[in-house]
Regions:
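Glycine-rich FAD pyrophosphate-binding loop
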Residues: 37, 53-73
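Extreme N-terminal leader/targeting segments of oxidoreductases
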Residues: 1-36, 153-156, 202-206, 211, ...
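Conserved N-terminal glycine-rich FAD pyrophosphate-binding loop of Rossmann-like flavoproteins
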Residues: 9, 64-88
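Short hydrophobic core segments
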Residues: 37-39, 62, 169-181
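Short FAD-binding loop at a beta-strand-to-alpha-helix junction that anchors the flavin cofactor
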Residues: 218-239
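Glycine-rich Rossmann-fold phosphate-binding loop(s) that bind the pyrophosphate
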Residues: 40-44
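Feature captures the FAD/FMN-dependent oxidoreductase FAD-binding
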Residues: 96-176, 185
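A conserved FAD-binding loop/helix module that cradles the flavin
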Residues: 234-266
């Protein structure tokens, strides 16, 4: 019996190009003004985005790389097993990620499985993403409230300075979440203007770090919520190393804080 050959639809090169450009432009135009812009598509940013989008908030993630997930793909030392301390495994259960309790309160999962599930969950919830888009600056309004971000294409930063006359563009939002990890890039732009003081992250101390990072996740400045390792940098908290429970729970807490801020603005 001869196998029937697949016959693809008749589509030309111009049709493909128009589809890419048209749909990108349509989506980008919608998200030039968002409820929440999240800078950084690592585990805490993705978690915050998933929670907010699931509540119906227009949520846009800005990611400088051409991939999402940050360090969530690899648990540490180039090994792709990641650890989560209880109660963080409850998020893995929510996402449908298999994990094993290897000692009391310490769970291990496959990094690629966990990361891909989180990315899919964020996308399924309705989060939209601008990849290869680098954060450049903040937008401020009355009272120095953060009201958006200034962005550019990531490859622009690699161009020789003498030919890099490529102005960035601005995106507006009601709330911005800094999920840029240890760099705390959004918070540091406020610091450059004397509007916020960051301390810098401390040395590794897993047991102290995770509790403190979730506890301190919140609004660091009007319109700006910090989550994940950016919290450590802003408040001088210990780093946690290759364990991810606090990243996930910090993202959830950031979403609650942002949602409360949006509700207050609506009033």
């Amino acid at each position: 019996m001869t196998e029937e050959l697949t016959k693809f639809a008749s589509v030309s090169e111009k049709d493909v190009t128009r589809a890419i450009v048209g749909e990108f432009a349509r989506q980008f135009m919608q998200y030039v003004e968002s409820d929440v812009i999240i800078v950084g598509g690592g585990p805490s940013g993705l978690m915050a985005g998933r929670e907010l989008a699931a509540q119906g908030h227009r949520t846009f993630i800005i990611e400088r790389n051409n991939y999402l997930g940050g360090g969530f793909w690899i648990g540490g030392y180039l090994m792709n097993k990641l650890t989560v301390r209880a109660p963080g495994q409850e998020v893995l259960d929510e996402l449908g990620v298999p994990h094993e309790e290897v000692s009391p309160g310490l769970h291990v999962a496959d990094g690629p499985h966990a990361c891909s599930k989180l990315i899919a969950a964020a996308c399924d919830a309705g989060v939209k993403i601008a990849s290869l888009t680098v954060f450049d600056d903040i937008v401020l309004r009355e009272g120095n409230r953060v009201a958006g971000v200034v962005v550019n294409w990531t490859p622009v930063a690699a161009m020789p300075r003498e030919i890099t006359c490529v102005d960035p563009i601005a995106l507006e939002s009601k709330v911005v979440i800094d999920a840029t990890g240890h760099d705390a890039q959004v918070a540091r732009k406020l610091e450059e203007r004397g509007l916020l003081k960051t301390v810098g992250f401390g040395a590794m101390w897993v047991e102290r770090s995770e509790d403190l990072i979730v506890e301190h996740t919140g609004e660091a400045h009007p319109g700006l919520v910090v989550c994940g390792m950016a919290v450590s940098t802003v408040y001088g908290l210990p780093r946690m190393g290759p364990t991810f429970g606090a990243m996930l729970l910090s993202g959830k807490r950031a979403a609650r804080v942002a949602a409360a801020s949006l509700a207050g603005i609506a009033k």
